[in-house]
Amino acid sequence: MGPCVRFLSLWVGLLCLVSGEVCAQVAHVPPPSRATIPLANIPRVTRAPKLEDYLEHRAREAELKVMDFRQYIPGDGIPASEPTTAYLSYDEKNLYVVFVCHDAPGQVRAHLSPRELLDQDDGVALYLDTFLDRQRAYFFFSNPLGIQEDGIYTEGQGLDTSFDTLWYTQGRVTPDGYIVWFSIPFKSLRFSHAPEQTWGIALYRVILRKSEYDFWPYITQRVQGLAQQFAPVGGLEHVSPGRNMQFIPYGLLAGDRFLNQPSPPNPSTPPAFQSVFEHRAGLDAKFVAKDALTFDVTLNPDFSQVESDDPQVTVNQRFAVFFPEKRPFFIENAGFFQTPVDLFFSRQIADPQFGARMTGKVARWTVGALAIDDRQPGLNQPPGSEYDTRAVDGVVRVAREFGKQSYIGMFASSRDFADTSNRVVSLDGRVTLSQNWVADFQAAHTWTRQDINLPQLCLQFNAPTQTGPNPPNSASQQGNSLFADATYAGRHLNFTTNYVDYSPGFCAELGFIPRVDIRQNNATASYLWRPKSKTIVDFGPVASETVDWDHVGTLQDWATAVALQVDLTHQTTFQLSRGEAYELFDNIPFRKHSTSFMVTTAPYKWLSLNGRFTTGTGENYFPAAPLAPFLGNVKRLNLGFTLRPFSRFRFDETYIYYRLGNREGSTPSGYASDSSIFNNHLMRSKLNYQFTRELSLRLIFDYDATLGNPQLLDFQTNLGSYDGGPVPPAKQFVTDVLFTYLLHPGTAIYVGYNNGLTDLNLDQTLLPPQVVYQRATNNSTSQLFFVKLSYLFRF
């Protein structure tokens, strides 16, 4: 750890030496005054405003006019560099917001894109804290052409853009900027049934070429969180979501041909190509009670054939790799069930048929409950056996707010499958200590009963020894976890430290807990200078550390890293970092290091780039038998770019390279230094053409190849199988074609085709037929064609 401390000291000293004048000028600048924001009232109108009213300067009814936008980044409270005016009004059914944004001719970044694919665009947004609880808010964003993105912002969790609702936008680029019109139905919001509403509101604008983010009212990084800084806005009288019911039936027709390899292998059912025609129908229904509680019921939840997981390295990974949820039923209102520790990860529910969920807010109480089944655990069980059934899962979450942006909550989950069960209970909370300090905590306990003859879902399970004439078929265990975190957030200094403890018997089957039997401390600190410069947004050092032990006191890992980061305009970031680490794996100690350089930039409206190169050392976690894990030389390269040559077209390219080479003094004898143990290549080419706001075409080409030395690498384990299990492809090329007609969330038509070429071949000259590798990646082992339709009925 000593070299990293010296490295950090060197960087800090060097920074202050070369920029001492800047440090002196910037570090002690007092914050701008933040006067108490008076309550503003939104006028009620009898005629809805239209976009043309602002384009043609027509006379309009009374509106709440907002002009004083202030910088959040790069400045803190200084006037926005480009003028913005917002106009707010409402009628019986809708809230209206119109943004008139001035900008230099030809400088506006706007593309005709799919909904929520707006990372390359300027835009405006509205935050709505409808319960004025300073904890969460709706987020409505539009680019200058009226393309939408929406989400839920929650203090401590950030912005969750999986939330989708029905609202309306129009946008137009003008010679001196752009104008965007919002119409948000009250039916799309949840709020109290008081006769007069007072909400927290923030208006937002982003100017990407300047890396500038503006707010009204003045919101500062000197204060922890956003919601407590929103402006109170009233005058909303006699509004209500009304009777709010919605039904989304969907239908799916699909033809699927694939190479089926039973797991575990069974001589009576050898590998074979299978063709399946599927027709599925389902229904999602939603009911709102007392304007605040939402009840969702689902039958055959909509699976996410239209979404595709982003490429991630899965080779030579000690712990499970996290892939986010994509299914609509689970991603909606997912934040209600989120806690500091990931006790609920809905991807653990693989194949549900029925489900019901309640989420909402009553006074200062936030509640969530979910009950759902899962057919997947019983799929391969003998017909009529005890385990030829389905699992039943339940989750309950309740939280009570107190003070200012603080809460205490309870979480409980249950999973039952035949005579096996898993129970989790937890207490967690968040306490705002000052305008900069916040603390989070969580304690959980689990009870687990497992059949020792079934695959175990716990990371560690102490099965009883099979002795005697009647050995037990099941066993039970309990476990605990603790989490505590303290975070300081400011404009220059940011610091967080936490402690995590999982006992050996801790098991949350519905959660994502990649490791147990650890006591771990993590800390991260950064200090950023923010000079008054036209190009430099901020710069400064970043440092982090991690150390953990098991529950008998054996040191398992430590890691420390320091970095220099520079942020410029045009969304440009440079970072140079150095890391040192120790890891105990398979009772073998390893000392590691890494050096990394990262850059991201979007210099033009039509181009953005990102890249990271890392070199160092790392373990071969799963070598070929009978070798023990050993240290090798690591090289990693992540490259990506986005091209937008014209408004309707977008091309994204991603390349990930991961190489582990032999290292002199560490690799088993007989292998040349730095010769390859494996090379992993992942490439994704993604093209999107937007014919209209509703109709689009998406093409994805994925290539994944793991080229390795079978004498040094256990291919079965590294490619996701096991010794004697199904044969995994070492090389695959997947083509994904999707036509989408999305009128609005809930109403859509999808037509898709997927074809996977691999290096696997079914050799039917053998008895029984076997799957073998071939040299070329030209054998289609999976094909899927589907048509999916859904329609939103709203009452």
Predicted region positions:
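Outer-membrane beta-barrel transmembrane domain signature of Gram-negative proteins
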Residues: 218-241, 377-425, 431-432, 573-637, ...
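Alpha-helix capping and helix-loop boundary segments enriched in small/acidic/polar residues
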Residues: 269-273, 317, 346-349, 382-389, ...
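Structural preference for beta-rich elements and adjacent junctions enriched in aromatics
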Residues: 24-401, 409, 419
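Exposed, low-structure sequence patches enriched in small/polar residues
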Residues: 351, 445-795
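Bacterial N-terminal signal peptides
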Residues: 8-21
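Outer-envelope beta-barrel architecture signal
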Residues: 93-95, 136, 178, 195-199, ...
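N-terminal secretory signal peptides that target proteins for export/translocation
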Residues: 1-6
